């Protein structure tokens, strides 16, 4: 597998206070991912891998097929967006990972997802 510059991934996270319970060490975050296909041919997302790290350094790995129950085809010049969630035990944490994808010819490649922060807004100065 190779990393491909043909696909761009952007992530934005938000704290979900209404579903969180700090007294029970439960902090809920939603994250919205936008995947843009900058190439000249269609690609398909087959799988995902996430490394979720809480504020104590405890790591959780999550992997599986597709995202939110789909294995989307993303046309040349197109984009795919989805929202999912993560629950951690601390008010600060991070996520990072990669997507396993194939191009129109079935050749596999990997798209790295850079680290992004999960943070309760009142903790960020």
Curated annotation (Swiss-Prot):
Residues 1-125 form the ApaG domain. GO terms for biological process: error-free translesion synthesis. It holds the Pfam family DUF525. InterPro entries: ApaG_domain (IPR007474), ApaG_sf (IPR036767), Uncharacterised_ApaG (IPR023065). NCBIfam families: PRK05461.1. HAMAP family: ApaG. This is Protein ApaG. It comes from Klebsiella pneumoniae (strain 342). The lineage of its organism: Bacteria, Pseudomonadati, Pseudomonadota, Gammaproteobacteria, Enterobacterales. The gene is apaG.
